[in-house]
């Protein structure tokens, strides 16, 4: 959110629509859950005890060869999603997947591998637990633990992770051939996929995916001639022998420690004194962004809003919705100071805004494959917002944040509609982002997910031009007039025409003719296999 913003109408054209979209949730309702397919979830532990080592799945029939499916190349870091589970308190022993340093006196510090009994797991994101080693009790983040001796506790198990995110992780610089992970299958409920980094002379570094099937008697196999009682034994076998795979499994794919869901238990509306502003990262028309520390323990980003920017009551109501939007391509909202001046506390992203990254950082040297992959990540996050029936309203490079390994996350979703500034609400002047805004939104205030699609098309031009201001040489009033007459930006220098065609789809005059974000995500993720397989790097891209 700043001096610029974006919007447009909902209702995808039929050729882009799919039938498996989750039921949408109104953005004005404050009690909905995150999308189960993509959100960074906490385990749901409730109800009766279950066997965590039982993995029911649809059996597969018939023999199978060692033919991998899929494949790709790119770079990114993702967080493995925790397992879904249920239990009654204290029966199952849990094991720590990561180290955790206590942030409050009520928290419990622990090391990876430490074991716990869960005392109270009714709180969702934070559980009361007792360390078996020390006897100490305290709250722990529920997405940092898994049932001991379950598949979720294995280092190589990455849970709900899509093919593309697996490829981004495995293809990170420094990873070697044979590095691997196991994840849930995207296409077959209850099944698994083995993803391995490979290399060949034609494709260079790439990733191969093998489907792990289940026998009627409960065993697992990739090929029927080699069957195993458990996934653990299957992985152990292929770590010792390639046995038909593209390469023997070597080391487990490294990953980053996931973000906790919130700063701590009950840390939502926090006192201003608990925050220390340390390094000013930027400023805009409505406030500043700082790197800071919460409670003397936790690095965070803090957005400070100028008094009068928005009504505190309206902000708090919207923030309650925003904090429920959970997806690994959205910057998580941790906490708020709800009295003016309003503070918004979020995850700190190491590389700052995408706009600055492209203009002044490492982004200046990126080639088209990396830029398209970043666009695909943004589309992934926007597809989630689309499924949740929410609207961003200010989608542009300045509101995308970049982390390590070219991770992109969407920030400031939903805040633009709360701005009280007269110049902004009149959709005129320097504070309003005319150049990113769909005409029906700029002229008539009709902001929908389809105006976000228009804005995404503008964001694509920012990516391929390394942060150039859209419509170069034109002032806001001229842009609005020319766009209404049918003018659209020409193909940027070095940009493939196929990518410009996607931009023009986003800029269709009729909002209903613009593609869905689901379509855009699919198009960009498969861009170099389906659309531009003969891509050769040029001077700029």
Swiss-Prot record:
Residues 89-150 form the SH3 domain. Residues 156-253 form the SH2 domain. It is found in: Cell membrane; Cytoplasm, Cytoskeleton, Microtubule organizing center, Centrosome; Cytoplasm, Cytosol; Cell junction. The modification Phosphotyrosine is found at residues 424, 535. Transmembrane segments: none annotated. Belongs to the protein kinase superfamily. Tyr protein kinase family. SRC subfamily. It comes from Gallus gallus. The active site is at residue 394. InterPro entries: Kinase-like_dom_sf (IPR011009), Non-receptor_tyrosine_kinases (IPR050198), Prot_kinase_dom (IPR000719), Protein_kinase_ATP_BS (IPR017441), Ser-Thr/Tyr_kinase_cat_dom (IPR001245), SH2 (IPR000980), SH2_dom_sf (IPR036860), SH3-like_dom_sf (IPR036028). Residues 1-20 have a biased composition (Basic and acidic residues). Keywords: ATP-binding, Cell junction, Cell membrane, Cytoplasm, Cytoskeleton, Kinase, Lipoprotein, Membrane, Myristate, Nucleotide-binding, Palmitate, Phosphoprotein, SH2 domain, SH3 domain, Transferase, Tyrosine-protein kinase. This is Tyrosine-protein kinase Yes. Residues 275-528 form the Protein kinase domain. Residues 1-43 are annotated as: Disordered. Its main location: membrane. One of its GO terms (cellular component) is plasma membrane. ATP binds at residues 281-289, 303. Its EC number is 2.7.10.2. A lipid is attached at residue 2 (N-myristoyl glycine). GO terms for molecular function: ATP binding; enzyme binding; non-membrane spanning protein tyrosine kinase activity; phosphotyrosine residue binding; signaling receptor binding; transmembrane transporter binding. Residues 26-37 have a biased composition (Low complexity). Non-receptor protein tyrosine kinase that is involved in the regulation of cell growth and survival, apoptosis, cell-cell adhesion, cytoskeleton remodeling, differentiation, G2/M progression and cytokinesis. A lipid is attached at residue 3 (S-palmitoyl cysteine). Autophosphorylation at Tyr-424 maintains enzyme activity. GO terms for biological process: cell differentiation; cell surface receptor protein tyrosine kinase signaling pathway. It catalyses: L-tyrosyl-[protein] + ATP = O-phospho-L-tyrosyl-[protein] + ADP + H(+). Signal peptide: none annotated.
